[in-house]
Amino acid sequence: HGQKLSRDLTESFKFAQSQQTSRPGNFVLKIRYTGLLDITHLNKHGIEFVSQEDNHLCVVFVDETGMTVFEDHLQRLGLDETELTYKQILEAIEGIDNWTSDDRKSWALRRHGLPRSEKFLLDVELWPVAVAHHPERLSTCDAFERWLAHNGIRRTDKVNLDSLVMYRLEVNSSQANLLLNHSDVRLVDLPPKSGIRYSQLNCDINRIPEGIQ
């Protein structure tokens, strides 16, 4: 079991290194597991829980140091003489994979594809690191916004809540594909046809602008 997971990790790490990033040295992995996974102690194995995506699927962050720890612990899994703290966490893991461009496509994007116009808007959700005004969240957003500027992508709107970080971006098809392969991006979606702005999501029901259906 440990050897299979080690092979999964090696392949996933290579793929993760090829993805776009605004925070060099930080990677995203997709972990499949059975039973209960003690997410509060994943850091004992060098990885940081980010998001629960399904009943038995979660996403974690890992840096190069954590990757070394994780790989070492997986290789020691199953060796009778080895004492591993929180060994049950590793035993619950069924597979290690990547969050790919297909994972990042919303239902609407998979159904309709990218718009055919030269420039178009996309709603791009980042992984919800920490909470809204936590230094780690602010650092992640700053790095992503620098990456946007470097790649000539214009931001038209942004929402930053404890459980949601989302940008509305003006892109061309090449820039859209960069976003679909960006490690900090959880989901890429087509904006609602109403054209509603994020700021309107928090307005009083009696003050909703005309024309929104």
Predicted features along the sequence, with ranges:
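Autoinhibitory N-terminal propeptides
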Residues: 1-150, 155, 159-161, 182-211
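Aromatic/histidine-rich interaction motifs
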Residues: 159-172
